[in-house]
Amino acid sequence: MAKSTILVALLALVLVAHASAMRRERGRQGDSSSCERQVDRVNLKPCEQHIMQRIMGEQEQYDSYDIRSTRSSDQQQRCCDELNEMENTQRCMCEALQQIMENQCDRLQDRQMVQQFKRELMNLPQQCNFRAPQRCDLDVSGGRC
């Protein structure tokens, strides 16, 4: 009798642990799909343009430094405004950064440019006064970048 009571208690404990794990997993999936919707909703173009301007340096030689600086600053502000429309969570910020990387991957001409882009991209949250993701894999699937 004591053995069956212990067995029933153990079985109940396993079921509770499994249900708790499933609930946590569903919550994570819900967070992820919420982030995906948010990333789809915001305009990441200003962020892409801001980072490309930073890594390309002087693109138009006839522009004065002040004009280029103002344009880059405007792009950064527009980028930060767009990112501010999303939840400031590690997961959502990482998904936004991943999307920017994926969108610009084909424009990055060599390995050095890819590394510069990733560095600037990881600095973007701090530039906007957001929390930076602790871990964020910016490698694009398919090995393109």
UniProtKB/Swiss-Prot annotation:
Membrane-spanning ranges: none
Keyword annotations: Allergen, Disulfide bond, IgE-binding protein, Seed storage protein, Signal, Storage protein
Any Pfam family hit: Tryp_alpha_amyl
S-S pairs: 35-92, 47-79, 80-128, 94-136, 105-145
InterPro entries linked: Bifun_inhib/LTP/seed_sf, Bifunc_inhib/LTP/seed_store, Napin/2SS/CON
GO molecular function: IgE binding; nutrient reservoir activity
Tissue expression remark: Expressed in seeds. Not expressed in roots, pegs (budding ovaries) or leaves.
Gene3D superfamilies: Plant lipid-transfer and hydrophobic proteins
Classification via SUPFAM superfamilies: Bifunctional inhibitor/lipid-transfer protein/seed storage 2S albumin
Endpoints of the signal sequence: 1-21
Domain of life: Eukaryota
Keyword DNA damage: no
Family: Belongs to the 2S seed storage albumins family.
Protein name (Swiss-Prot/TrEMBL): Conglutin
Organism: Arachis hypogaea (Peanut)
